[in-house]
């Protein structure tokens, strides 16, 4: 018999996370590694757990996640987005709480491109009057 699974895709900056929620005891596996092994910073671990804590589902699901692209902060945000979307597949009544917390919104902020004639996206070379 097939297990019940809930899928969600999350994105943030250049990161894309494919998240599966499987009924279990609360393990969070990211790219075949435990949450504590994958993210060193406590703030990133907290970001990943936020939707589960908000909806009181922290011990009910195992989170299996494949994430690629970007840095650690972007990946943590993408996982949070993916978990939130997967929770909606589990129970649509969680939508108001998740939406109010802002977990369903795809953060549109991206790195601004570097322009020619400038050192960075907006940083101009030093100006000399004489």
Curated annotation (Swiss-Prot):
NCBIfam families: PRK00132.1. GO terms for molecular function: RNA binding; structural constituent of ribosome. Belongs to the universal ribosomal protein uS9 family. Residues 105-130 are annotated as: Disordered. Coiled coil: none annotated. Residues 111-130 have a biased composition (Basic residues). GO terms for biological process: translation. Keywords: Ribonucleoprotein, Ribosomal protein. This is Small ribosomal subunit protein uS9. GO terms for cellular component: cytosolic small ribosomal subunit. Signal peptide: none annotated. Pfam families: Ribosomal_S9.
């Amino acid at each position: 018999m097939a297990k019940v699974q809930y899928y969600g895709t999350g994105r943030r900056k250049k990161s894309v996370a494919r998240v599966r929620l499987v009924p279990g005891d609360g393990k969070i596996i990211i790219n075949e590694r435990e949450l504590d092994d994958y993210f060193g910073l406590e703030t990133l671990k907290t970001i990943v757990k936020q939707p589960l804590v908000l909806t009181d589902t922290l011990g009910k699901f195992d989170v299996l996640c494949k994430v690629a692209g970007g840095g650690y902060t972007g990946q943590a945000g993408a996982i949070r987005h993916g978990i939130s979307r997967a929770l909606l597949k589990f129970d649509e009544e969680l939508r108001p709480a998740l939406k109010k917390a802002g977990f369903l919104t795809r953060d549109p902020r991206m790195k601004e491109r570097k322009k020619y004639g400038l050192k960075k996206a907006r940083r101009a070379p030093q100006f000399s009057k004489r």
